[in-house]
């Protein structure tokens, strides 16, 4: 079956198969998926942006490796009211869709930043535990 773990901004789904051990590549993919929406909103927060520009940045940062993941996430974020888009004529072909954050999206992103900071701090404490002074 599929279990859904919901952390304030992380929606991870893990396929559980008792006959197959969890492998490192799957674990890496799941960790990246958990921060993908946050990264997409962060990129859009810099100003209106074309989807292929987002894809290039996410791919070069090794956050996204599958192109088919971006468009469903953009649709979900738009349906949630976090972003909007506008069509801009292009001299080199059909009009292009440029994404922008809404006010609700800006507020949501600010909350995610706080969650990200907390999460980084928490994980850092686990990875680098402080030994108590005697």
Please identify what each model-predicted range represents.
Residues 107-134:
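Amphipathic alpha-helical dimerization/coiled-coil segments
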Residues 81:
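Glycine-centered, phosphate/nucleic-acid-interacting loop/turn motifs that mediate DNA/RNA or nucleotide
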Residues 75, 90-91:
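Short secondary-structure boundary/capping segments
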Residues 70-72, 76-77:
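Basic amphipathic alpha-helical segments that dock to polyanions
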């Amino acid at each position: 079956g599929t279990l859904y773990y919901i952390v304030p901004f992380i929606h991870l789904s893990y396929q559980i198969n008792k006959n197959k051990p969890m492998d490192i590549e799957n674990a890496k993919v799941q960790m990246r998926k958990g921060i993908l929406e946050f990264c997409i909103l962060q990129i859009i927060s810099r100003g209106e942006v074309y989807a292929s520009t987002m894809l290039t940045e996410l791919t070069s940062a090794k956050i996204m490796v599958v192109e088919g993941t971006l468009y469903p996430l953009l649709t979900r974020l738009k349906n949630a009211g976090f972003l909007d888009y506008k069509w801009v004529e292009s001299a080199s072909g059909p009009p292009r869709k440029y994404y922008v954050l809404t006010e609700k999206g800006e507020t949501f992103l600010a909350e995610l930043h706080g969650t990200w900071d907390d999460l980084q701090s928490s994980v850092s404490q686990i990875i680098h535990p402080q030994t108590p002074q005697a």
